[in-house]
């Protein structure tokens, strides 16, 4: 149930420190990235690792010390995301996990879910390199850096910290590099979508469209995962704004959902289709402007 609450106040610095940095920035100035997918096999080790890693996580804090000060952009970043199995492995109780959306709890590899989103045939989960029943993941470390050398040092440190606490292993490593000409493989300019979020900036889309615990464009608070008050004795989490859930905490506040999809792109096939369609439509319009107006 959605609850109508009106507030467009800018985020406090405390809230910004509680929001992960990748939610509010694509870190476009950092061209090198690594995605390190993890498995947890010891709960206490996983919790200790997360406590020790927490101070290193890049938050959404302002890049300006003062309003009139220049930006101090980070030269490297670290963010984390967890799957439902990862949260369970960290000790999150089942009744809290049940308050998450079914799409998250079931995951993309679930038979009905994969069918709904078109992951069938050659794209079926059974053929995935990871993220399926054969090679599940509990979490991912997202690293960005200003140089390949810096990224490699950060990757080694991340892996070493896992070993030091006796925690699981890195299942798979994926790497990405932003092209110097800012063009993706199809030849189009790759401007990572990054809408302005109201509360982070003075104008933009309401925060609830991207961040849990806030008002969305419809003027409501979307449903957020819940945690019983008895599991938050220190009162670290705010109360749920939903009157039907009095006595429960808003576990999702300042969090969001992340989707990682690995796709194979057929560049030659795409442009072959474009040429064929251009010939078919040649008598109707200028094919170059009709199909390629956004290609740079």
Report residues per predicted region:
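Long, low-complexity, Ser/Thr/Gly/Pro-rich intrinsically disordered segments that act as flexible linkers
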Residues: 1-296
């Amino acid at each position: 149930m959605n609850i109508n609450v009106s507030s467009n106040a800018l985020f406090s610095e405390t809230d910004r420190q509680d929001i992960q940095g990748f939610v509010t920035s694509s870190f476009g100035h950092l061209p090198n990235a690594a995605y390190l997918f993890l498995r947890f096999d010891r709960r206490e080790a996983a919790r200790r690792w997360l406590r020790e890693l927490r101070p290193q996580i890049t938050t959404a804090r302002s890049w300006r010390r003062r309003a009139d000060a220049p930006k101090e952009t980070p030269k490297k970043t670290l963010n984390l995301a967890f799957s439902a199995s990862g949260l369970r492995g960290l000790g999150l109780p089942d009744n809290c996990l049940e308050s998450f959306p079914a799409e998250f709890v079931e995951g993309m590899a679930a038979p009905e879910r994969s069918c709904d989103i078109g992951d069938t045939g050659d794209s079926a989960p059974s053929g995935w390199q990871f993220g399926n029943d054969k090679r599940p993941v509990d979490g991912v470390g997202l690293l960005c850096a200003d140089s390949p050398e810096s990224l490699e040092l950060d990757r080694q440190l991340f892996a070493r910290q896992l070993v030091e606490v006796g925690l699981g292993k890195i299942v798979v490593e994926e790497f990405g590099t932003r092209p110097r000409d800012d063009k993706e493989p199809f030849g189009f300019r790759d401007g990572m979508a990054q809408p302005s979020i109201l509360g982070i900036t003075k104008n933009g889309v309401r925060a609830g469209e991207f961040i849990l615990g806030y008002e969305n464009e419809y003027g409501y608070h979307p449903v957020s995962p819940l945690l019983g008050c008895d599991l938050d004795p220190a009162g670290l989490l705010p109360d749920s704004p939903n009157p039907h859930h009095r006595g429960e905490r808003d576990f999702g506040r300042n969090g969001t959902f992340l989707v990682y999809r690995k796709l194979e792109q057929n560049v030659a096939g795409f442009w072959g289709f474009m040429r064929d369609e251009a010939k078919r439509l040649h008598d109707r319009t200028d094919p170059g402007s009709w199909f390629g107006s956004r290609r740079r």
